[in-house]
């Protein structure tokens, strides 16, 4: 079976346009309900969380209707981070978890992703089976077996308490001034409260969601305001989350950014010294910088690369039994603590390193020199396949010859947007620019 509706991170699109319509969400809920509750089975429960997008109300109600129509009992969590849904699915012994979010995308977009009873995102195979059910006639429950829906008030609080248990026992953040940018998203209450309860002086940004300002000039994809706040307040560190708080970017005391590669390098080195890094292996995607690979190799550590997408990082970690992975974009996966990327937990681990070592954020967030990397995105029209054009393939082959032995080239379609991502790494920056610009021009001509 193949997946057409699901991308690399669930179903995603523009709100009120296919597939992010109330009609599709209702049927998707019913299909998921029938997948997790075969005809004649008991009354499983599902938890539903969402971020702060205006369209979340519509999709939450539609999903609830579809799920209850097949006999699923629904527990509504309200706005919570994506990793909270994974945690609460397990903690509340639910059979299914659902998160309504388009992560770092603007408010006009939204998405739906599913978690299994173990708190991990569903496999490609499970999503394909749900699509197959969706394509057919979905049998509803008998009138006496229709599910119920109930709003849960303490879901966020349960997650916050769990977050604090991952912080080293007896350690506090007294004396640390922390800027936290919540992107007007799902962690707008949880993140500042956890930091304050651990003793930090908290300067919160992006904590006034209005349904339309999620990720708007704030958060991990737009950290400029947080960087300015770090400098203006003389803060020790900045933590920037995205709209659903599953990714993080760290800012040092000068407001300079540290991406997921630098964060993973710090954690891998510390965990290896402490004997916590399983099989001396870090899992990251093909997008991670060559400098990270060199840093790990110099310390006798191994980098296992996967396709782009935190779900593929997690799948590789589970297959190999490894416990640390992530993406350059800021998804940091620590399976000792969570089933998916968790920006708040990663931020807490960085703060713990600061508190335990007494070192500045700038000293901890620059583990290696990055190899110059250039990434450009090219938007294309629906139905087009520019990468199959002979002219594009010829330019790519020529670029590979020019980079041979001196760098890396990666060209791929986005799994969540109609974009071609062109990425190259090379010590020779002039060659790097030439190669990327030539490929981008060819893709634009073919798109």
From Swiss-Prot:
UniProt-annotated binding residues for Mg(2+): 103, 242, 244, 246
Active-site feature positions: 103
Name of the gene this protein is made from: glmM
UniProt keyword annotations, A-Z: Isomerase, Magnesium, Metal-binding, Phosphoprotein
Residue numbers carrying Phosphoserine: 103
Domain of life: Bacteria
Source species of the chain: Cereibacter sphaeroides (strain ATCC 17025 / ATH 2.4.3) (Rhodobacter sphaeroides)
Any GO BP annotation: UDP-N-acetylglucosamine biosynthetic process
Enzyme class: isomerase
Protein name stated in the entry: Phosphoglucosamine mutase
Catalytic activity line of the entry: alpha-D-glucosamine 1-phosphate = D-glucosamine 6-phosphate
């Amino acid at each position: 079976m193949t997946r057409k509706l699901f991308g690399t991170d669930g179903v995603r699109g523009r709100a009120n346009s296919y597939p992010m319509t109330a009609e599709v969400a209702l049927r998707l809920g019913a299909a998921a309900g029938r997948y997790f509750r075969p005809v004649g089975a008991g009354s499983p429960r599902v938890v539903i969380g969402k971020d702060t997008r205006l369209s979340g109300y519509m999709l939450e109600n539609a999903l609830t209707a579809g799920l209850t129509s097949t006999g699923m009992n629904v527990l509504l969590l309200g706005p919570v981070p994506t990793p909270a849904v994974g945690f609460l699915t397990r903690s509340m012994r639910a059979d299914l978890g659902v998160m309504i979010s388009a992560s770092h995308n603007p408010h006009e977009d939204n998405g739906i992703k599913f978690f299994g009873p173990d708190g991990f995102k569903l496999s490609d195979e499970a999503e394909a089976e749900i699509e197959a059910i969706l394509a057919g006639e979905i049998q509803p429950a008998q009138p006496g077996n229709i599910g119920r829906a109930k709003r849960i008030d303490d879901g966020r609080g349960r997650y916050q308490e769990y977050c604090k248990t991952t912080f080293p026992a007896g350690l506090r953040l007294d004396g640390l001034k922390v800027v936290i940018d919540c992107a007007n998203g799902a962690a707008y209450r949880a993140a500042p409260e956890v930091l304050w309860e651990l003793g930090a002086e908290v300067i919160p940004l992006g904590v006034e969601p209005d349904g339309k300002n999620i990720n708007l000039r704030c958060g991990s994809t737009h950290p400029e305001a947080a960087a300015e706040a770090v400098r203006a307040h003389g803060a020790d560190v900045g933590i920037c989350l995205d709209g659903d708080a599953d990714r993080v970017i760290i800012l040092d005391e000068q407001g300079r950014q540290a991406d997921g590669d630098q964060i993973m390098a710090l954690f891998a080195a510390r965990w290896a010294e402490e004997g916590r890094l399983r099989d001396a292996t870090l899992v990251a995607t093909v997008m991670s910088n060559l400098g990270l690979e060199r840093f790990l190799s110099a310390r006798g550590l191994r980098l296992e690369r996967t396709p782009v997408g935190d779900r593929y990082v997690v799948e590789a970690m589970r297959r190999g039994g490894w416990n640390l992975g992530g993406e350059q974009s800021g998804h940091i996966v620590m399976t000792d603590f969570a089933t998916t990327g968790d920006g708040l937990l990663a931020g807490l681990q960085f703060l713990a390193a600061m508190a335990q070592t007494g070192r500045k954020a700038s000293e901890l967030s620059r583990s290696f020199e990055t190899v110059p990397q250039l990434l450009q995105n090219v938007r294309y029209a629906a139905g087009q396949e520019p990468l199959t054009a002979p002219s594009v393939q010829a330019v790519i082959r020529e670029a590979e010859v020019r980079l041979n032995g001196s760098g890396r080239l990666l060209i791929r379609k986005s799994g969540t947007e109609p974009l071609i991502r062109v990425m190259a790494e090379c010590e020779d920056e002039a060659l790097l620019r030439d190669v990327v610009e030539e490929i981008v021009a060819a893709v634009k001509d073919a798109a």
